[in-house]
Every structure is written in C-alpha cells, then in structure tokens.
C-alpha cells in the first residue's frame, strides 16, 4: 500500500468533469482505492472554496465524496510550515500552498500526485497525472 499526498489540482479535476485532467484524476483515484490518500488541510480549504460559493449542498457533496474516498486530512503544523517555507525560499516559482504539499510528501515519505509537471524538478516524489 502506497501513501499518496494529493494536490488540489487532482481533486479539483476529479470533481470537475470539464477539467482537462478529469479522466486522469478519476483513473488515478480509482487505482488509489487501497492506498493511504492524504490531503493537507490547506488543500482541503482550497478545494472547498467553489462549493462554498455554490452553497451548503455542494459543500456536503464534496465532503461526502472525500469521506467515501477515505481521504485523511493532515494538519499543517510548525514543522511542515518551516519545511514549506524552506522550499518556497529556494524554489521561487512555486506558491506557498504548493510548497506545503511537496513538504508534506517529504515529511510523510509519500508520493505526491499533481497535475503540475513543473513540480518534478523540485521533488523526486512527484507523480504527474
């Protein structure tokens, strides 16, 4: 069983049939059914923005889908924040949210699944959809 840290791009694509990466995200999460899928708390916030704009029913649907997919929400603590800051300082092209996901993959010894091919230059753990 693998450990996977999921970037927001994967989950946004999964929930958005019109997204260019939708089919890849659905296929990847189906293959991950027996894996430990980890979502950083900051990623949870990112993927809930649109449902909150739509309304409470949309939020409930996304949260139910995450539960059905057995997603584990991982907190952002001081150690993770420091590692993300270090990554952001040395890789200025990535955003802080992206650095948090990459830092979590390192911290948890997990694969990092994303739609961002550029992340492959930052960590050997990155797997692009």
Regions found by a protein language model. Name each.
Residues 1-39, 51-64, 117:
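Short, well-structured N-terminal submotif of metal-dependent ribonuclease cores
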Residues 8, 78, 98-99:
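Conserved glycosyltransferase catalytic-site signature
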Residues 17, 67-90:
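Acidic catalytic patch
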Residues 32-35, 68-69, 90, 108:
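Structured helix-beta-strand junction loops
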């Amino acid at each position: 069983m693998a450990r996977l840290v999921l970037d927001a791009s994967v989950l946004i694509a999964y929930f958005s049939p019109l997204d260019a990466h939708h089919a890849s995200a659905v296929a990847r999460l189906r293959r991950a059914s027996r894996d430990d899928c980890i979502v950083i708390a900051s990623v949870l916030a990112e993927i809930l923005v649109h449902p909150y704009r739509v309304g409470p029913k949309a939020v409930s649907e996304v949260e139910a889908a995450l539960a059905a997919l057995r997603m584990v929400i991982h907190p952002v603590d001081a150690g993770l924040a420091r590692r993300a800051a270090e990554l952001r300082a040395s890789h200025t092209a990535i955003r802080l949210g992206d650095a948090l996901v990459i830092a979590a993959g390192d911290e948890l010894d997990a694969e990092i699944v994303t739609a961002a091919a550029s992340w492959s230059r930052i960590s050997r753990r990155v797997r692009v959809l």
